[in-house]
Regions:
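P-loop NTP-binding/switch modules centered on Walker-like glycine-rich loops
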Residues: 1-78
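Charged, flexible cofactor/metal-binding loops and thiol motifs
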Residues: 50-136
Length: 136
């Protein structure tokens, strides 16, 4: 049923030349329906880009965690436990200073606790990208 509804939405958007905003944690739905994706954490943009680029090369640790937590159907993965992003979501009325994901992030740096990262390379809000060079 879900596939039928999503196919209908895609067809209507194409016929009418419109767009749709889907809000979901279902990475499969995103992969099948979205041209572009924005990943939010605590109401703030963590990563944005073309769906293929974000799903094949996630740059923000939260996006990486979401993708790692997606069930797979490959035989070699069926007996493996799904990845869980550590910790819990912060209270949205008490978002910490710095990166909102820093308390759950496995890759934090001292700067993550102090300053909210800007969107770097027009792609992800993460201090880990600050010193990277080249084209993404």
């Amino acid at each position: 049923m879900q596939a039928q509804i999503l196919a209908l939405l895609k067809r209507l958007c194409k016929e009418r030349g419109t767009s749709i905003i889907l809000i979901t944690h279902d990475m499969g739905v995103i992969a099948e329906t979205a041209d572009r994706v924005g990943v939010l954490y605590s109401g703030r943009l963590a990563e944005i880009g073309l769906t293929f680029e974000v799903l094949s090369n996630p740059m923000h640790p939260y996006t990486q965690g979401l993708i790692a937590a997606t069930p797979r159907i490959e035989p070699e993965t069926l007996d493996k436990k799904l990845y869980q992003i550590p910790g819990t979501m912060p209270n949205l009325s008490e978002i910490p200073d710095g990166c909102p994901f820093h308390k759950r992030c496995p890759k934090t740096t001292p700067k993550c606790f102090e300053v909210k990262p800007p969107l770097l390379y027009d792609r992800a809000s993460c201090w880990l990208l600050e010193n990277k060079t080249g084209v993404i």
